[in-house]
Regions:
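Metal/cofactor-centered catalytic core regions of large enzymes
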Residues: 1-134
Length: 134
């Protein structure tokens, strides 16, 4: 397990990464390919989600990721884009979908998460406060 991950993004790409535990695994992971240093998923999950409220750690990403906000490095899910399952890799890339051999999730949620959306006009709108939907 990789714990206490810290990353710095520049231009949409990880330029620095460190983990208190599992750092060598993290470094190898982000060196897999060019897409491994970019986000493939961002998911907002309220701190009060039923799985989070259960207090259980399943040690299974498919369950645990539903307990907290999470991000994933690597491959984007094409099915998250309109008609994504019919698009070529080039069309997916033109729509901003990342391509990589990996898709690795990690949880970042807590009751301290604040998220703001930025409109096309540059205005900031609160989306989450203290880990909950506004």
């Amino acid at each position: 397990m990789i714990e206490e991950i810290s990353v710095r993004f520049q231009g949409g790409k990880i330029v620095e990464a460190h983990a208190a535990r599992g750092n060598q695994v993290l470094q190898r992971m982000i060196e897999t390919d060019e897409g491994a240093r970019r986000l493939g998923e961002v998911s907002l999950v309220p701190h009060s989600s039923p799985i989070a409220s259960s207090g259980l750690l399943f040690l299974n990403t498919l369950f645990d990721e539903n307990a907290a906000c999470h991000i994933a490095l690597g491959q984007a899910y094409s099915t998250c884009l309109k008609d994504g399952d019919t698009l070529t890799p080039e069309q997916l890339a033109s729509r901003g979908a990342n391509n990589s051999l990996i898709h690795v999730d990690w949880m970042i949620g807590s009751n301290r998460i604040d998220v703001d959306g930025i409109s096309a006009a540059g205005d900031s709108e609160p989306v989450m406060r203290a880990g909950e939907w506004v």
